[in-house]
């Protein structure tokens, strides 16, 4: 079940992309930030409020198979690039896929420290870069 919200001249569809994307036609590019794996969700905390780790994420995590389905839906909707910030374990599932182009990293300018203080905090987010193959690859006007 999806919900449509209008924001000015934009339409935001709140729903499962595996159900919604096939109804929208094709796009030049899909940029997405799907939910991460269960371990990431379980460990995600904020120190706002009481000064100690409070659960931060209130939506469901994706299994590896769920992530595969989400990326398949994104690739099906894209005539070219699919760029996803994702759990590194999910990204690794695509390393040998024909659509795989590259892994990137978004380096956090001010990452949250590890609340447990028993290891370093995560300083980056994995960026999975795929291409549907429906048109030739071109990035940054050929650069």
Where are these regions (language model features)?
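Short, acidic/polar N-cap/turn motifs at the starts of alpha helices
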Residues: 1-2
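Core catalytic lobe of class I
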Residues: 5-143
